[in-house]
Design a protein with these regions (language model features):
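One-carbon transfer enzymes
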Residues: 1-277
Length: 277
């Protein structure tokens, strides 16, 4: 189940043969088209802001302001990249649904007889959807949920002065990002300019790492070599305040400059000073 078809396609191409050799079949791919966002952007933005306000226990205007500022700030200087089409294998049924929380999504999973579901870059499932699916649901979270739950990815680690994020595959439960942990792996934060560029670069590289982590967890579950880890959930975070956004921007640029300076110094050391002939 995914809202990022390219990620699902990458996962299948990379791991289909190995999973089959381990006795694991991919029953279907359910793609969330998020039709509400496409048909009414204003209602979509308000809906996201309401969820953020509820989680952060803040006012709707405040949540809406943080949402707009974060989107504009994180996308500043972003270059539009061509989106390549993704060919999902014809042998694997694929379904396009208005939302992963729709009846169509649940019916598609049940019709294919799936024993478990994986959320690849998907949105939050509602309590009723979790109950109706009625089986193990695995989700990928770009942080250690003992440190922080919620969003945005990478941001809170940057603000904490970290050099890595801890990618996590955990069970989906009603409480956000609080289900038992099935696998984790460190991913380096790629400081490369401001906070927006840093998040994008880190998450782009994390897609491959998370894909491999999902596959390893599925293989381990099938072989019964993976033991779920219960934990005390960390705090839930939402979109940051403007002051936090400014602080993260400064931290990213300082670290990016330090990395560039270090690389240049290393290059000069390796090459050595030019010698007169």
């Amino acid at each position: 189940m995914t809202s990022q078809e390219a990620w699902a396609g990458s996962f299948i191409r990379r791991w289909l043969s190995r999973l089959r050799s381990e006795g694991i079949e991919i029953g279907c791919v359910v793609v969330d088209e998020n039709r509400t966002r496409r048909t009414n952007l204003v209602n979509h933005v308000l809906s996201v802001a309401k969820r953020q306000a509820k989680v952060a226990r803040s006012s709707l205007p405040g949540a809406l302001l943080r949402l707009v500022v974060f989107r504009l700030w994180s996308n500043f200087g972003r270059r539009d990249e061509a989106v390549t089409g993704t060919d999902l294998p014809e042998a694997i049924p694929s379904f396009r649904v208005p939302s992963l929380n729709s009846a169509e999504a649940v019916d598609a999973v049940h019709a294919c007889g799936c024993d478990a579901s994986c959320l690849l870059g998907a949105r939050i499932l509602t309590k009723s959807t979790i109950q109706e699916l009625g089986h193990l649901i695995l989700n990928g979270h770009a942080s250690d949920p003992r440190f922080v739950r919620g969003r945005p990815p990478v941001f809170w680690e940057v603000l904490n002065g970290d050099w890595h994020v801890c990618l996590t595959v955990h069970q989906v439960v009603q409480k956000l990002d609080a289900g038992p942990i099935y696998g984790q792996r460190l991913q380096e934060i790629l400081y490369c300019g401001g906070i927006g560029a840093t998040i994008r670069a880190t998450m782009q590289q994390a897609l491959v790492t998370m894909t491999d982590l999902f596959a390893e967890v599925l293989i381990g579950l099938h072989a019964r070599t993976v033991t779920p880890i219960e934990f005390n959930p960390g705090p839930v975070r939402t979109l940051p305040r403007i002051s936090q956004l400014i602080h993260a921007e400064i931290l990213c640029r300082r670290r990016s400059k330090r990395i560039r300076t270090g690389s240049q110094s290393a290059g000069q050391f390796l090459l050595g000073p030019s010698q007169p002939r």
